[in-house]
UniProtKB/Swiss-Prot annotation:
GO BP field: DNA-templated transcription
E.C. no: 2.7.7.6
Function: DNA-dependent RNA polymerase catalyzes the transcription of DNA into RNA using the four ribonucleoside triphosphates as substrates.
GO molecular function, one term: DNA binding
Subunit structure: The RNAP catalytic core consists of 2 alpha, 1 beta, 1 beta' and 1 omega subunit. When a sigma factor is associated with the core the holoenzyme is formed, which can initiate transcription.
Species for this entry: Lactococcus lactis subsp. lactis (strain IL1403) (Streptococcus lactis)
HAMAP family hit by this protein: RNApol_bact_RpoC (MF_01322)
Gene3D superfamilies tied to this protein: 1.10.132.30, 1.10.150.390, 1.10.1790.20, 1.10.40.90, 2.40.40.20, 2.40.50.100, RNA polymerase II, clamp domain (4.10.860.120), RNA polymerase Rpb1, domain 3 (1.10.274.100)
Entry binding sites for Zn(2+) 1: C60, C62, C75, C78
Highest classification ranks of the organism: Bacteria, Bacillati, Bacillota, Bacilli, Lactobacillales
Protein name as annotated: DNA-directed RNA polymerase subunit beta'
Length: 1207
């Protein structure tokens, strides 16, 4: 028996008739399944035990031989071999077909492989196979052509004319088989290659396609005639089961019906042929057999699908593989697993970062085998069976054992949809009463979970290795940073933010203002006894606070508030005292203006200091990031728990509530509204007089109401009272934003109609005043549209993620350094005046490609091939450097992956990336996960300036990654040179731009409404846009090189995401874009044996040319091809990965013809065949580590081992 997990690769091919017979354990001759009286399988039927194996383990059909003793013996009564019933899942049968039958995949697929092999049109093939025409196989001496089609009538005429036997013509798949047998592949290939040198146009394309198929057959060793079946395999019966329902009826797999149709027709055909029936009857039966086999292989591919009960099309063999419910996606890529459960989640505010609460009755079921083993070990149960009974009875000792078993055994919690890797994290279980899983409040953001009825699944890692990995790599306390941008993902929210905001507020003139304390303990006593308030401004001796003071701050008195003393008491030692929400205070030290000498009057000092704003949500995130940067995970997760507890405690003490009286009233709201009404009347009058168009009127009216809403909003912000609880919630970032506030206190404003257009009638009321019936009706439109948009967007975004993961799943960090000499020059990404992504963010965590010098002094800031830290990046920016050359994924030479230096740091840990990290999947998740936050709409820019629609949001991201022609396309120049002239032509409402290059001059026509990006006399490089809009990347690739296209696409994706406030690290987009440009199309094959027009991986192409050059031959030339992610996924080298993605039958047909070998480099292929994935700890270099023998203790170790075995 081969070891299932040891093979290197997997090959697929076309099965020869001999192979099918070799697989088979016997011929299925009858369409019968089960005898309805005895409930036993019929002999020679579809469930025959003699062919497929016994239904019960170690027992023959008649019951004569029972037990393992008779292993592998064949019963002489019933002829059944004694073996396990599992063999019914493995043993195949076969049907000997009475006539050859064509395989529908090879005849009907696009392009028709049979047609290309024979140089016949698919239509001609169809006529022959389905007995509509004869095809000439051997014309002999007649004037007929080989492969010429003859109708029944022409055939008879030719027979009369030339005599019987003067030529050979046949019908059906038999004819096709004869023709396929006649093809001499080697001869055809050499003839076609000769012809290829001279022809052009359509004929050339046709020849290349034929050559492709023929050379595929030649290389793979498949015979052309195997595309026609003489023997049909029958799959094992347990894969097409038949089960009895209560009531004596049977439910059966559709395949059994399909097989029965084939067997019935095959048997009838045999009988007709034995009887020498008239030719027409036999032909009809053959055609019906052909159709039956077609239906079995792929129902509905040709003609109308065969339906079963209730007009449902039957599921054929092809449908078993296809789609979400097919074998690949349903059973191979995702399986249901044991040792799992699910329940509703509730908040666990008392838990530590690394803990979760697991209900006892869930835990007892999950940990059952562990508990049973412990019971036996502790001699609380005699054997496993007794232990099992004990657990089922839930005896009292079971619970104590459970406590010990659960200790330090991490569990995995997963919330669907799992959009990124933080959707599954490990926690240490804490047993609780009740039935809900308890989740740590800070883990919510990563899971995107809330407690309004969300459910979560729980899984148990079983083996020691799995537990170790869960503990070391997946523990929730380790996941402080978000892999997409390297920012903290566990920032406090809601109550925690509110409590800390309230704690750090300052108020002038609160009780006890100006008191000076010696120690923090004194402050606390004073507060407890009501001498001071949390917000009171006080002084405290710096020497009592264990903080890194500067020299001139020591032995002074710090002016701060009571709350801030408490807030700073939980911050790790070594961090500065935080007295104001500034970056300087956080990274270096507290500002000197907050310090006074012991003799000074504190009242005077306080009068000179303005009140400081409290700490909001964003600043808390900065503090966490700084703590992480200094102390890494353990200290950060401890600090987070302290911050959480403090926040909850203080918000409870603060007791903030909201009532209708807390919503402020804008006194002169009616004035603003009246002014708006007047302005709208003026606009309407202008329109009536014909001074403005209807579009202009519409834009002006909506503009007026927008301005009115903004004016009210501005008033609310200017007049807001910072002690108002609603304002506090909003200002702190705990809940709500200015738009919610302005709808409560200002006006609701304009609403969208069902068609997405904005209605001119605004909602003037706010929620405090209450809406009128009409206003309420209008708001329902917008609300309903919002809901549908969200639902559609989620599906779209999920599908985008699936395609992204598929195209990048085999990108893994495979080596330390690829040694490339190329790099990527980067600078700020900006659109016009607006900064999209500053250079600083693009530098941090990357390696340099060239050393960076100070522009003025010329001294070296950082050497070549060195990691850029935040501090160095800050130095580079401060020196005024505008461009830096860095190592980039785009220029990495590692085949099938990336190297450490081209990738840089792993954003999730802040350290250098490890070999084995699955960066492709992480990149795909980082781009897909925020997809739901992008808008669905394609924005209309409004106004007259630019009339074209510019796609934005999710549709734009899809457009970029699918490499489609963009809407609102920008015209680009194809030459480098100077803009000579821009001439307007009022008659045609166009402008002509002339660009003069060194060798030639080009002219481009653009519309009057287009916004120009160039001016006369400007020097531009080829590929530069002349007008505003999106460049078509495929056109850019023709004009410039691949790197320019990659850089452009990177910038475009960043613009789309950043405009919506989503930050994503460059490297993730680089990984995805590189996958779109992995292929080269061969233009001229030189002296290599590759076909022109072939798509090849860049690394394979370069290796091929290297070999050619070493042998002194002509290398091939090719041009890079830009593919959309769907196309790129289907063109991957792994047929398993492509088949499980989309177009399963097409991918498998093609792979079978080529005899493709899958080297199992990616993640998907290995998941499908059940091998450990070649990433992370499953990587080859980590799995084959032999422990070094320590020879000094060798004998003792052996003894210990034998003892454990005996135990």
């Amino acid at each position: 028996m081969v070891d299932v997990n040891k093979f290197e690769s997997m090959r697929i091919g076309i099965a020869s008739p001999q192979k099918i017979r070799y697989w088979s354990f016997g011929e299925v001759k009858k369409p019968e399944t089960i005898n309805y009286r005895t409930q036993k399988p019929e002999r020679e039927g579809l469930f025959d035990e003699r062919i497929f194996g016994p239904q019960k383990d170690w027992e023959c059909a008649c019951g004569k031989l029972k037990g393992v003793f008779y292993k592998n013996q064949v019963c002489e009564l019933c002829g059944v071999q004694v073996t396990t019933a599992k063999s019914r899942r493995e043993r195949m049968g076969h049907i000997e077909l009475a006539a050859p039958i064509s395989h529908i995949w090879y005849f009907k697929g696009i392009p028709s492989r049979m047609g290309l092999a024979l140089d016949m049109s698919p239509r001609a093939l169809e006529e022959v196979i389905y007995f509509a025409s004869y095809v000439v196989i051997d014309p002999k001496e007649t004037d007929l052509e080989k492969k010429q089609l003859l109708t029944e009538r022409e055939y008879r005429e030719q027979l009369l004319k030339n005599g019987f036997g003067s030529f050979v013509a046949k019908m059906g798949a038999e004819a096709i088989q004869d023709l396929l047998n006649d093809v001499d592949i080697d001869k055809e290939v050499s003839e076609l290659k000769e012809e290829l040198k001279t022809v052009t146009g359509q004929r050339r394309v046709k020849i290349i396609r034929r050559l492709d198929v023929l050379s595929a057959f030649r290389k793979s060793g498949n015979a052309l005639s195997w595309m026609v079946l003489n023997v049909l395999p029958v799959i094992p019966p347990d894969l097409r089961p038949m089960v009895q329902l209560d009531g004596g009826r049977f439910a059966t797999s559709d395949l059994n019906d399909l097989y029965r149709r084939v067997i019935n027709r095959n048997n009838r055909l045999k009988r007709l042929m034995e009887l020498n029936a008239p030719n027409i009857i036999v032909q009809n039966e053959k055609r019906m057999l052909q159709e039956a086999v077609d239906t079995l292989i792929d129902n509905g591919r040709r003609g109308r699908p065969i339906t079963g009960a209730g007009n449902r099309p039957l599921k054929s063999l092809s449908h078993m593989l296809k789609g979400k419910q097919g074998r690949f996606r349903q059973n191979l890529l995702g399986k249901r697993v044991d040792y799992s459960g699910r329940s509703v989640i509730a908040v666990g505010p008392t838990l530590k970062m690394y803990q979760c609460g697991v209900p006892r009755e869930m835990a007892i079921e999950l940990f059952k085998p562990f508990v049973m083993a412990q019971l036996v070990k502790k001699e609380l149960a005699a054997n496993i069976r007794a232990a099992k009974r004990k657990v089922e009875r839930q005896d009292s000792d079971v619970w104590d054992v459970l406590e010990t078993v659960v200790k330090e055994h991490p569990v995995l919690l997963n919330r669907a949809p799992t959009l990124h890797r933080l959707g599954i994290q490990a926690f240490e279980p804490v047993l609780i009463d009740g039935k809900a899983i308890r989740l740590h409040p800070l883990a919510c953001e990563a899971y995107n979970a809330d407690f309004d009825g969300d459910q979560m699944a729980i899984h148990l890692p079983l083996s020691e290795e799995a537990q170790a990995e869960a503990r070391l790599l997946m523990l929730a306390a380790e996941h402080i940073l978000n892999p997409k941008d390297g920012k903290p993902v566990v920032t406090p929210s809601q109550d925690m933010v509110l409590g800390n905001y309230y704690l750090t507020m300052e108020e002038k003139g609160r009780e006890g203002e100006g008191m000076i304390f010696a120690t923090p303990e004194e402050v606390e006593i004073a507060m407890r006894n009501g001498y001071v308030h949390l917000h009171t401004r006080i002084g405290i001796a710096t020497k009592s606070l264990n903080k890194p003071w500067t020299e001139n701050q020591k032995d002074k008195i710090l002016v701060t508030t009571v709350g801030k003393v408490i807030f700073n008491s939980i911050i790790p030692e070594g961090m500065p005292y935080l007295n104001e929400p500034t970056d300087v205070n956080l990274t270096t030290s507290t500002d000197d203006r907050f310090f006074m000498d012991a003799g000074q009057d504190i009242k005077e000092v306080l009068a000179g200091i303005d009140t400081v704003r409290p700490f909001k949500k964003g600043y808390l995130g900065n503090i966490i990031a700084e703590v992480f940067k200094r102390y890494r995970t353990t200290a950060t997760s401890e600090y987070l728990d302290r911050l959480k507890n403090l926040g909850y405690h203080q918000s409870t003490l603060a007791g903030l509530t909201v009532g209708i009286a807390d919503i402020p009233v804008v006194e002169d709201k009616h004035k603003i509204i009246d002014a708006a009404h007047k302005r709208v009347e003026q606009i309407t009058k202008q329109f009536r007089r014909g001074l403005i168009t209807d579009d202009e009127r519409y834009n002006a009216v909506t503009g007026v109401w927008r301005d009115a809403k903004e004016a009210l909003e501005k008033r609310l912000i200017d007049e807001q009272d910072l002690t108002n609880p609603i304002v506090m919630m909003m200002d702190s970032g705990a809940r709500g934003n200015i738009s919610n506030f302005s709808q409560l206190a200002g006006m609701r404003g304009l609403m969208a109609a069902p068609n997405g257009k904005i209605m001119e009638l605004p909602i003037i009321s706010n929620f405090r005043e209450g809406l009128s019936v009409l206003e309420m009706f209008f708001s329902t439109h917008g609300a309903r549209k919002g809901m549908t948009d969200t639902a559609l967007k989620t599906a779209d975004s999920g599908y985008l993620t699936r395609r992204l993961v598929d195209v990048a799943q085999d990108v893994i960090i495979r080596e330390d350094d690829c040694g490339t000499d190329r790099g990527l020059v980067i600078s700020d990404i900006a659109t016009g005046k607006e900064m999209v992504e500053p250079l600083f963010e693009r530098l941090v965590g990357r390696y340099t490609r060239k050393s960076v010098l100070h522009p003025e002094t010329g001294e070296m800031i950082i050497a070549d091939d060195t990691l850029i830290s935040e501090d160095v990046a800050r130095k580079i920016i401060d020196a005024g450097v505008k461009e830096v050359t860095i190592r980039s994924v785009f220029t990495c030479k590692t085949p099938h992956g990336v190297c450490k230096h081209c990738y840089g740091i792993n954003l999730a840990t802040g350290d250098a990336v490890e070999v084995g990290e699955a960066v492709g999947t992480i990149a795909a998740q980082s781009i897909g996960e925020p997809g739901t936050q992008l808008t669905m709409r394609t924005f209309h820019t409004g106004g007259v300036a630019s009339s074209s629609d510019i796609t934005q949001g999710l549709p734009r991201v899809q457009e970029i990654f699918e490499a489609r022609n963009p809407k609102g396309e920008a015209i680009i120049t194809e030459v480098t040179g100077t803009v000579e002239s821009i001439v307007e032509d009022p008659a045609t409402r166009t402008r002509e731009i002339t660009v003069k290059g060194k060798t030639d001059t080009r002219s481009y026509t653009v519309g009057m409404a287009d916004v120009l990006m160039v001016e006369e006399g400007e020097f531009i490089h080829r590929g530069a846009p002349l007008i505003q809009g999106s460049i078509e990347p495929k056109h850019l690739l023709q004009v410039r090189d691949a790197l320019s296209v990659e850089t452009y696409l990177l910038g475009e994706v960043q613009k789309t995401y950043r405009s919506q406030g989503v930050e994503i690290g460059d490297k993730h987009i680089e990984v995805m874009v590189r996958q779109m440009l992995r292929k080269v199309r061969v233009m001229d094959n030189g002296s290599t044996d590759i076909l022109p027009g072939t798509l090849m991986d860049i690394s394979d192409f370069e290796a091929l040319n290297e070999t050619a050059l070493l042998n002194g031959e002509m290398p091939a030339t090719g041009r890079p091809v830009l593919m959309g992610i769907t196309k790129a996924s289907l063109e991957t080298n792994s047929f398993l990965s492509a088949a499980s993605f989309q177009e399963t039958t097409r991918v498998l047909t093609d792979a079978a013809i080529r005899g493709k070998e899958d080297h199992l480099l990616g993640l998907k292929e290995n998941v499908i065949i059940g091998k450990i994935i070649p990433a992370g700890t499953g990587m080859f270099r980590y799995r084959n580590i032999e422990p070094l023998a320590d020879l000094t203790n060798a004998p003792e170790v052996e003894e210990v081992e034998t003892e454990t075995v005996e135990n």
